[in-house]
Regions:
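Short, charged recognition helix plus adjacent turn
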Residues: 67-82
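Key DNA-contacting residues within the recognition helix of helix-turn-helix
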Residues: 15, 40-41, 54
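A short, Lys/Arg-rich alpha-helix, primarily the initiator
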Residues: 1-21
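Alpha-helical residues within the helix-turn-helix
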Residues: 19, 30, 58
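Recognition helix of helix-turn-helix/homeodomain-like DNA-binding domains
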Residues: 33-48
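DNA major-groove recognition helix of helix-turn-helix/homeodomain DNA-binding modules
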Residues: 51-67
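Short alpha-helical "recognition helix" segments of helix-turn-helix
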Residues: 24-29
Length: 82
């Protein structure tokens, strides 16, 4: 992905992260201590919880952020659950 901001659905975000990474979805699922198909199955769903998205994004090396639309300032980083 380039540095351009993308407006996409959460499942598209997961698919893009998976495609951009050298790590496989199976690698990330196992790193999280979950079923080997967890990440792939999650990316196929239309109802991914924010906590799940934050957890998978963090495992791929990304932060999930809330950005102020008026200022384009990153206001909050959503931490995955501990």
């Amino acid at each position: 992905m380039d540095n351009e901001t993308k407006h996409v659905s959460h499942s598209d975000v997961l698919k893009a992260i998976m495609n951009d990474s050298d790590k496989t979805a199976t690698d990330i699922s196992r790193e999280l201590g979950l079923n080997r198909s967890y990440v792939t199955n999650t990316a196929a769903r239309n109802n991914v919880r924010i906590e799940t998205l934050a957890t998978i994004a963090a495992a791929y090396g990304y932060d999930l952020a809330l950005i102020d639309r008026e200022t384009n300032e990153t206001r909050y980083i959503i931490e995955p659950p501990k």
